[in-house]
């Protein structure tokens, strides 16, 4: 089985072709970072228009790179949500229309399910069940995963997602967009423990997250301490340490609560090396394993959508003729691949 995957949920156009026997055949990605840099963040209308320009050419490139034709495809998977509604509609319209024209099934994929399954693209892939930590610009979720489509959300952010907090704090520090990776780079120059930020919601029971207060704490610290380069680095490190410690504490709590020994970490923030290092130490201390996608599949990409779509199609899950985007779409509402439609 061979699937074309289309990802257009935010500011990256990702196209990929995945074969269940041969693996990933091609992977094309166009990032809109330069387009949005002058605005300090993603402008939804500009994002949608750029997806319109880039999606079809990237599909053509992916077919050529995979050395295959449209006749060799068994289905088209596209991100239907959650995300920016205009951006989602571009991918949904193109994916559903091409599937109709080529007489093959269309599969609507949940963006976060794509991230959750991204480590399955690697040789060292996790076995079910596992605990998943999904950390991105728009979401922070702790999920107990029994199988594909069998998700219990144990905790989530009640305000800013981890990646959003990184970006907002980076902006306070005067760093260019995208701020998260730049803040992590700046933190490498920081002096440990010069500033101590709170670890929000770690003294209370439960697995929910809250990161907006850290942004406020950072803003107050910047206003009080000034903006000389070393102080900026020290604040960046203190902020990053607070986020990572908070996430690690919640992961440890969730692993003990569920009894699971495998942890999957995915989403854009999962590329953070300090986060990876701390969670590796945690899992070693608990006698467990941690799994990540490769860096290029931490951020939005078509490969994860193609893979997730393939699993759905194998289970007989595909779309009718309607075209819809779901900017809000709870992960735990998805059907199990072991369920019949």
UniProtKB/Swiss-Prot annotation:
InterPro entries: ATPase_NBD (IPR043129), Gcp-like_dom (IPR000905), KAE1/TsaD (IPR017861), Peptidase_M22_CS (IPR017860), TsaD (IPR022450)
Subcellular location: Cytoplasm
UniProt cross-references to CDD domains, sorted A to Z: ASKHA_NBD_TsaD_bac
Primary localization: cytoplasm
Cofactor comment text: Binds 1 Fe(2+) ion per subunit.
Molecular functions (GO terms): iron ion binding; N(6)-L-threonylcarbamoyladenine synthase activity
Principal EC category: transferase
Cellular-component GO terms for this entry: cytoplasm
UniProt keyword annotation of Nucleotidyltransferase present: no
SUPFAM superfamilies assigned to the protein according to its UniProt record, in alphabetical order: Actin-like ATPase domain
UniProt: substrate binding residues: 134-138, 167, 180, 272
Annotated EC: 2.3.1.234
Binding site for Fe cation: 111, 115, 300
Catalyzed reactions per annotation: L-threonylcarbamoyladenylate + adenosine(37) in tRNA = N(6)-L-threonylcarbamoyladenosine(37) in tRNA + AMP + H(+)
Keywords: Acyltransferase, Cytoplasm, Iron, Metal-binding, Transferase, tRNA processing
Signal sequence range: none
One of the GO biological process terms: tRNA threonylcarbamoyladenosine modification
Gene3D superfamilies: 3.30.420.40
Requisite cofactors: Fe(2+)
Pfam families given in the database record: TsaD
PANTHER family tied to this protein: TRNA N6-ADENOSINE THREONYLCARBAMOYLTRANSFERASE, TRNA N6-ADENOSINE THREONYLCARBAMOYLTRANSFERASE, MITOCHONDRIAL
Function: Required for the formation of a threonylcarbamoyl group on adenosine at position 37 (t(6)A37) in tRNAs that read codons beginning with adenine. Is involved in the transfer of the threonylcarbamoyl moiety of threonylcarbamoyl-AMP (TC-AMP) to the N6 group of A37, together with TsaE and TsaB. TsaD likely plays a direct catalytic role in this reaction.
Protein family membership: Belongs to the KAE1 / TsaD family.
Entry protein name: tRNA N6-adenosine threonylcarbamoyltransferase
Gene name as annotated: tsaD
């Amino acid at each position: 089985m061979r699937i074309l995957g289309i990802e257009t949920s935010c500011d990256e156009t990702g196209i990929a072709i995945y074969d269940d026997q041969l693996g990933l055949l091609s992977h094309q990605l166009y990032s809109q970072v330069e387009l949005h840099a002058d605005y300090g963040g993603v402008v939804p209308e500009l994002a949608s228009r750029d997806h319109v320009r880039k999606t079809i050419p990237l599909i053509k490139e992916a077919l050529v790179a995979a050395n295959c034709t449209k006749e060799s495809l068994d289905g088209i998977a596209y991100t239907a949500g959650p995300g920016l509604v205009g951006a989602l509609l571009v991918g949904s319209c193109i994916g559903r229309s091409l599937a109709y024209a080529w007489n093959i099934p269309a599969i609507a994929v949940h963006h976060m399910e794509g991230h959750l399954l991204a480590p399955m693209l690697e040789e060292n892939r996790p076995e079910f069940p596992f605990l998943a930590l999904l950390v991105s610009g728009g979401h922070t979720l702790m999920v107990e995963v029994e199988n594909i489509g069998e998700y219990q959300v144990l905790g989530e952010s009640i305000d800013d997602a981890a990646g959003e907090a990184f970006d907002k704090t980076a902006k306070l520090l005067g760093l260019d967009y995208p701020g998260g990776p730049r803040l992590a780079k700046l933190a490498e120059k920081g002096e440990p423990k010069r500033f101590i930020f709170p670890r929000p919601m770690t003294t209370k029971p439960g697995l929910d997250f809250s990161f907006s207060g850290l942004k406020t704490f950072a803003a107050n610290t910047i206003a009080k301490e000034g903006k000389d380069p070393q102080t900026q680095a020290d604040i960046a490190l203190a902020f990053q340490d607070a986020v990572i410690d908070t996430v690690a504490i919640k992961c440890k709590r969730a692993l003990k609560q569920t009894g699971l020994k495998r942890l999957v970490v995915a989403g854009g923030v999962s590329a953070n090396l300090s986060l990876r290092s701390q969670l590796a130490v945690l899992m070693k201390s608990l006698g467990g394993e941690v799994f990540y996608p490769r860096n290029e599949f931490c951020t939005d990409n078509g490969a994860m959508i193609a893979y997730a779509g393939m699993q759905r199609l194998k289970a007989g899950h595909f779309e009718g003729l309607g075209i819809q985007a779901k900017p809000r779409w709870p992960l735990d509402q998805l059907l199990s691949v072991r369920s019949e439609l």
